[in-house]
């Protein structure tokens, strides 16, 4: 019995010997961020806490541009149940979103009757990526 106790104590001491203190760094959660909408107004993502968000990269000159129709349908069908779509236009995927914010807004409203929130054109990768994507 003494042998087992000593072995257990040795095991516990060994475990803590290999642990290293690590300073915890506060990481922002999704809902701690804000992002500008297509009209340059702030979208506080905290307003969506407790809801389901589909944050989707979009582009008007992309092979998937027709996805706007499906995204709008999803938004309309489920927004009253707490499901929201937020479109994030970016020109960082093969230059497929070259337009200005006003051109993007006009394109989305004219061609797809988009009513879900769309952000301003946003960098989503690289050094200048929006904090939400880091």
Q: Model-found features: residue ranges?
A:
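Aromatic (phenylalanine/tyrosine) cluster motif
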Residues: 3, 16-19
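Bacterial N-terminal signal peptides that target proteins for export
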Residues: 1-8
